[in-house]
C-alpha cells in the first residue's frame, strides 16, 4: 500500500491570514509548506515586486575587483576570462566578457581580452596546462579572471601568482581553504556574505562585477540597456543551475523572463524566443529548452559553440542556433544508445553497476542516474581521461547507502580523488585498478547490514497539495505560471479519487493518451498527457485512480500533466 501525503502540511495563523486576505489558496499552501519565510512569501505575493530590480554593489570585494580590471584595461594588459562548460559558466563568461569588451572599445584601450571555456574532457576549473601556456606566452601585464570556478584550484592559482600573473577569482562554490592569501576573491561563501549573495549563481556574481566595472566607464553608451541584457542571462543561469530561490534570485528570474519577453538579452536568446514563437516564456521553457541546449554543447565537448552562439549577431545567429539544436539532438541520441549499450553489459546479479564506456564524458551522470533509478543499485559510469591512465566517473546512489563515504573508504591505491555527496559523486581511479576497485566496492556493499541494503520500495508519495478537477482552471494556471521561483522543482499535485470514463491513444504515439475523467462531485474533465500510456496499460487500465502531476496550460487551455498513476486500491491518502 502506498501512502500519499502532503509536503509538511503546515497550518499557522500567517497562512490563514493570507488566504483570508484573498490570496490564491493553492499558491499560499505551496509557499508556506515549502518553508519560505514570511518576508519571502510577502515579496512573492506582492504585485509590485517585479519592479524591484536587483542591486549590484553589495557583494564583498566586487568594487575592488572592478578596480583591478579597470587598472588592467588602462594599462593595456592582456586579460583572460576562464569559465566553465555548463550553462552557468558560459553565461558568466558572456556577461563579464561583453562588459570588458565594451569598456576596452569605448575607452580606446589597447588591452586585449581572450575567453577560455574548457571542454568537459579538460576537466572542471583552471587547468594547469592552460596556466602553463599563459605563463610561457606572457609578454605584458596579464590578468586572469575566473568565473563560476577558481575557488578550489589552489595549485593553479598559486602557479599563476608565482609567475607574475594577477588573478581575480569570481565564484559561487564553497572554498577548499587552500587558496593563496594574496589573491582577490569574490565569492560569498569565502567572504561569508549574506544569504542572498550566497544564493547567487556564477552569472549572478559576474553580473555584479560587470556592472560595477561599467560604472567606471561612463564612456560606454546605453549602460542601462546592458544592465537589462545581463539580467536576462543571469535568469537563464539561475534557472539552469537550479539555484535556491532567495529574494534576489526571485528578482533575477522574474525580471529576466519579463525582459526577455520585451526583447532584451543577447541576439542569441532573443532569437531563441522568436524561433520558438514564444513571447509568453516561463522558467520551464528555459529549464527544458534553452538551458539543456546550451548544456549539450559542453556535454558533447563543443563548448566553443555555446560561447560563439551567445556572442553571435544577426548575421550568424540562425546558423549557430541550428548547430546548437543539432548538438542537443545528438546528445539525446547518444544518451539513449549509451544506456542501451550499458544495459547489455551490466551484471544484474552484481551488488553494483560499474561500467566503462567510450566517449560518454559529458553524459556519464545522465546514464548513471538512469541505471541507478531503474535497477536500484549504486551505479558508476567511467570513461578514460585523455592520457588513458585514469578513469573519470559519475556515481549515483540508489537510495540505500551513503555512496560518498563508501567510495572514500576504498583503498587509495585505486582511488585518486572523489567528491560530491551521498547521492551523487564524481570519482577518478587508476585505469589499471578497475577490477580491484569493483571487487572492493562490491565487498563493501555485500557486507553492509541487511537493513541498510534492503530493496528500495517507494512506500510514500509526497505532493505539494491535493486538488480536485475544479482546481484545474485558468486562475490557478496563471498563478502557477507566474511563480518563477519554482525552478528548483515544479509544484506537484495529487488529483485524487477520479474515475476514468474514456481513454484514447494518439495515432502517432501510443504512449500519449487522452483521458476523460469525472469526480465525486460530478465534475468532468478531458485532457491529453504525454508519455504515460505504457504505464497505464501496465497497470491494467484501472478506472478509479489518483493522478500525480502538474497543473499547466496545454493547447491554450488548462490541463494536467501526469507524472504517475496510482490505482485507488493501492493508495492510502493521509
Describe the residue ranges of each PLM region.
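Acidic, metal-coordinating catalytic cores used for nucleic-acid/nucleotide bond scission
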Residues: 86-89, 121-123, 146-153, 196, ...
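Active-site cavity-forming subdomains of large catalytic enzyme subunits
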Residues: 132-133, 137, 141-203, 207-216
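Hydrophobic residues positioned within well-ordered beta-strands of beta-sheet architectures
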Residues: 513-515, 545-547, 560
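Short nucleic-acid-contacting surface segments enriched for D/E, G, S/T with interspersed K/R
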Residues: 532-548
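OB-fold/S1-family single-stranded nucleic acid-binding modules
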Residues: 555-574
Amino acid at each position: 500500500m502506498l501512502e500519499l501525503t502532503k509536503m509538511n502540511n503546515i497550518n499557522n495563523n500567517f497562512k490563514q491570514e493570507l488566504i483570508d486576505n484573498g490570496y490564491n489558496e493553492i499558491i499560499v499552501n505551496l509557499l508556506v509548506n515549502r518553508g519560505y519565510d514570511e518576508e519571502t512569501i510577502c515579496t512573492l505575493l506582492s504585485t509590485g515586486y517585479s519592479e524591484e530590480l536587483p542591486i549590484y554593489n553589495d557583494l564583498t570585494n566586487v568594487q575592488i575587483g572592478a578596480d583591478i580590471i579597470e587598472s588592467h584595461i588602462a594599462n593595456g594588459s592582456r586579460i583572460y576570462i576562464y569559465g566553465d562548460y555548463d550553462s552557468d559558466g558560459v553565461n558568466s563568461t558572456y556577461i563579464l566578457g561583453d562588459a570588458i569588451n565594451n569598456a576596452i572599445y569605448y575607452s580606446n584601450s589597447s588591452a586585449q581580452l581572450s575567453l577560455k571555456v574548457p571542454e568537459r574532457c579538460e576537466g572542471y576549473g583552471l587547468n594547469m596546462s592552460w596556466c602553463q601556456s599563459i605563463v610561457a606566452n606572457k609578454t605584458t601585464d596579464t590578468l586572469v579572471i575566473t568565473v563560476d570556478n577558481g575557488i578550489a584550484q589552489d595549485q593553479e592559482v598559486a602557479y599563476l601568482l608565482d609567475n607574475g600573473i594577477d588573478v581575480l577569482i569570481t565564484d559561487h562554490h564553497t572554498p577548499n581553504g587552500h587558496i593563496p592569501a594574496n589573491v582577490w576573491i569574490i565569492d560569498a561563501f569565502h567572504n561569508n556574505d549574506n544569504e542572498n549573495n550566497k544564493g547567487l549563481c556564477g552569472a549572478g556574481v559576474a553580473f555584479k562585477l560587470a556592472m560595477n566595472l561599467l560604472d567606471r566607464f561612463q564612456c560606454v553608451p546605453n549602460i542601462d540597456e546592458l544592465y537589462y541584457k545581463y539580467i536576462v542571462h543571469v535568469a537563464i543561469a539561475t534557472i539552469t543551475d537550479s539555484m535556491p530561490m532567495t529574494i534576489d534570485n526571485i528578482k533575477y528570474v522574474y525580471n529576466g523572463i519579463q525582459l526577455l519577453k520585451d526583447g532584451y538579452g543577447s541576439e542569441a536568446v532573443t532569437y531563441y524566443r522568436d524561433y520558438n514563437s514564444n513571447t509568453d516564456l516561463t522558467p520551464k521553457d528555459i529549464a527544458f529548452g534553452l538551458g539543456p541546449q546550451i548544456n549539450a554543447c559542453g556535454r558533447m565537448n563543443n563548448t566553443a559553440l555555446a560561447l560563439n552562439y551567445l556572442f553571435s549577431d544577426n548575421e550568424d545567429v540562425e546558423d549557430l542556433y541550428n548547430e546548437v539544436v543539432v548538438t542537443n539532438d545528438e546528445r539525446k541520441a547518444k544518451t539513449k544508445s549509451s544506456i542501451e549499450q550499458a544495459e547489455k553489459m551490466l551484471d544484474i546479479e552484481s551488488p553494483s553497476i560499474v561500467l566503462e564506456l567510450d566517449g560518454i564524458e559529458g553524459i556519464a551522470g545522465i546514464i548513471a542516474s538512469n541505471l541507478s533509478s531503474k535497477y536500484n543499485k549504486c551505479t558508476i559510469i567511467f570513461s578514460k581521461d585523455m592520457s588513458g591512465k585514469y578513469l573519470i566517473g559519475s556515481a549515483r546512489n540508489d537510495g540505500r547507502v551513503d555512496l560518498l563515504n563508501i567510495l572514500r573508504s576504498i583503498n587509495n591505491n585505486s582511488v585518486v580523488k572523489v567528491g560530491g555527496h551521498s547521492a551523487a559523486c564524481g570519482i577518478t581511479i587508476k585505469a589499471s585498478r578497475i577490477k580491484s576497485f569493483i571487487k572492493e566496492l562490491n565487498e563493501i556493499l555485500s557486507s553492509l547490514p541487511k537493513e541498510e541494503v534492503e530493496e528500495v520500495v517507494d512506500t510514500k508519495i509526497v505532493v505539494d497539495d491535493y486538488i480536485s478537477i475544479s482546481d484545474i482552471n485558468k486562475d490557478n494556471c496563471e498563478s502557477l505560471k507566474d511563480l518563477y521561483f519554482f525552478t528548483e522543482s515544479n509544484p506537484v499535485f495529487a488529483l485524487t479519487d477520479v474515475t476514468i470514463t474514456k481513454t484514447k491513444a494518439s495515432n502517432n504515439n501510443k504512449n500519449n493518451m487522452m483521458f476523460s475523467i469525472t469526480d465525486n462531485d460530478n465534475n468532468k474533465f478531458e485532457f491529453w498527457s504525454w508519455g504515460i500510456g505504457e504505464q497505464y496499460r501496465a497497470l491494467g487500465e484501472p478506472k478509479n485512480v489518483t493522478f500525480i502531476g502538474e497543473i499547466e496550460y496545454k493547447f491554450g487551455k488548462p490541463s494536467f500533466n501526469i507524472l504517475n498513476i496510482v490505482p485507488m486500491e493501492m493508495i492510502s491518502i493521509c
